[in-house]
Amino acid sequence: MFQCLEPERNEETGPVYVRERGKLSVVGSHVSELRTRPCRLFSKGFSVELCGKQEDTSRHRQKPFIFTYTKEGSLRYSAKSLFTLTLDLITDNIHYVDSLMGFPDQIAEKLFTAAEAKHKFFTPCNGVMALRKFTEAYGDLVLSSLCLRGRYLLISERLEEIKSFQCLRSLDLSCCKLGDEHELLEHLSSDPMSSLTELYLKDNCFSDTGIRKMTASLRVLGKGLDALKVLDLSSNPGITDRGVLFLFGFKLLQFLDLSDTSIQDRSRTVKKIETKIGLVLSKKPIIQFEHRNCRTQGWAEQLLDQWENYIFSAIKPKDTLKSRKAAQQFYGKETKQNPLDSGICTLLTPVEQKQTHLQFFRPEEQKDSDSSKSDKRQRSTKRTGADPGQEDCTIAPATKRPRVTLTAADWDLLNSY
């Protein structure tokens, strides 16, 4: 039997085993009986691991207790409060929250600070969604004033996050080199930016086309930057006499800066601005355009600094900068200051060009009369307006978002758990 099967054996397939009368033997071998080891079900390095729910092991798991010291200096173990544990749970799952409307401002501020500490606003998709939930519910409490002067890297990297801020009253985009085709210029005329009262657009390479785009919704639909009071368009050589005509829609404007532009007929432009808007040419520099009081204010003030530090740490090699600075100090060379570090605004206008002072202001006598006229005009347009949805857009954010505040007794009750 073994001799018949011998020619059919292939070396590539390996030995062929035959069981006969309860004994195992190899086909073609002279050994009738072969001692074999028991066959393994799995390989030698195989292992089985029983695991439950997979958790993120990269982050440190917070324990539900804290250690404090007594007056005597001994270590005391105490559990976290229920409010703190609940706050941590909501912070870890902030992207699953549907809305924050109706939550008290004090709790929302603590929740925003906790989410900021855990870098919940850094991810591209979930970070923008979480930030919009805060801005939609609390508006100017998240950010009321935003200063992006010379921070064009932050604008390019965090554009969607910046566009999510609503109910801003002051916005400084000076020295950011945006241009007429930038996406942020179109966003300025949208409904979330209708609460702006101060807008600084100095040195942004704007022309008459950019001014036309920015004021299109105000001139055609009567919506957009209708509450604007301070406008800075200086150091934009592309703005000419034709671009000034698009500014006549700002009826509440009190301060206007058109210095260092390409306006040819100065006297005619001054007369048009005085008759259409009621602004008078100022002989002295106006304090509002010195950018002294413009700064970022709100809950997200430190968040913007974290974004900017993260961007700079990614583009700047720290070791080479330190070694270069040490070598320059050793050889006595003067170090050149980087505009990114100092925040200096470098203008595009050449130094040889003669600077023209062209700043306008509204006299004190006309401020009260113009404001009353504008209020009456807005009320009449609301009554004769077509859509009730447009009326809702013009309502103040404070009336649209009723806020709940906690008293001292409420805080004592929360801390007692």
From Swiss-Prot:
Pfam families linked: LRR_6
InterPro entries: Leu-rich_rpt, LRR_dom_sf, LRRC42
Compositional bias annotation for Basic and acidic residues: 362-378
Assigned keywords, A-Z: Leucine-rich repeat, Repeat
LRR repeat locations: 167-188, 195-215, 227-249, 252-273
Region entry Disordered, spans: 360-399
Family: Belongs to the LRRC42 family.
Record's protein name: Leucine-rich repeat-containing protein 42
Native source organism of the sequence: Xenopus tropicalis (Western clawed frog)
Lineage: Eukaryota, Metazoa, Chordata, Craniata, Vertebrata
